Amino acid sequence: MASYASEVKKELTSIEVHPEHAKAELAAFLRMNAVLSRHDGQMSLDIVTENPAIARRIFSLIKTAYGFEPQLIVTRKMKLKKNHQYLVRVAQMVSEIMADLEIYSPKKGFITGVPDKIKYSEQRSMSYLRGGFLASGSVNNPETSRYHLEIYCTYANHSQDLQEIMNKYFDLNAKVTARRSGSIVYLKEAEKIGDFLHVVGAVNAMLAFEDLRIMRDMRNSVNRLVNCDTANLRKTAGAAAKQVEDIELIDQKQGLESLPEKLASLARFRLQHPELSLKELAEQVPDGPISKSGVNHRLKKLHEIAENLR
């Protein structure tokens, strides 16, 4: 069964984009996942994934953005022998693509942050975030886990740039923390996670997330109410048991007939109906109905009499 995060990514890989947005998405993919290699004396950019939908996405983005098809190599993992690995290899226009996507320049070397032309464009930022999430993002199932979405980055300045984009344009309240020789930018609020899914284009996943979140919140509310009702019932039952104990002591020591009529009437009624709440006693007592405070006053009198007899 596919994980919730896998379903989100599957939806994202089906989105059709303009060549400029394909470049923005591809810039995130290559910056975060690509390895610069040399094969047969020729430079190449290699991206490895176990997700076939993501491999197809990278293939499609390169074709859309640069007009050629990269190599797609499928291998089987040696240890598990059941999972395939997909290698997307860009073996042409490598220098041009790296320069165009501002991943490398002769003057600056490798560029680890988000390029300005993306960082200062809300539309390109949306595509870049989509690429970043597909490259190294994850999101918990809202039905079974705590709310959490994250994107892992090797470089701290890259995660800080992603945080800036998320908060500046989309008010996502993203935070950054160090993690395993890198850092993550993450979201913890359910509403903000739903907003992020909408921003990157996972509309169906966002709607499913909201449905699951609402159901979970409703279940939590019902559980709180049930727990509250249970606690109130226990409290009522405990108070009633003490009242019955007081009345039985009075009956044993001096008899209920020795009490003033109003106290005796309530005492007999409480013995007959130990399950009733204070409100129900006030409504149903034979000489009533009376107020809850009136019932409470009489019960306190009975308690004082019982304490004097102990």
From Swiss-Prot:
DNA-binding region, residues: 277-310
UniProt keyword list: Cell cycle, Cell division, DNA-binding
Entry superkingdom: Bacteria
One BP annotation, GO: regulation of sporulation
Short name of any one Pfam family annotated for the protein: LAGLIDADG_WhiA
One GO molecular-function entry: DNA binding
Biological role stated in the UniProt entry: Involved in cell division and chromosome segregation.
Annotated family: Belongs to the WhiA family.
Name this protein carries in UniProt: Probable cell division protein WhiA
Organism: Lactobacillus delbrueckii subsp. bulgaricus (strain ATCC BAA-365 / Lb-18)
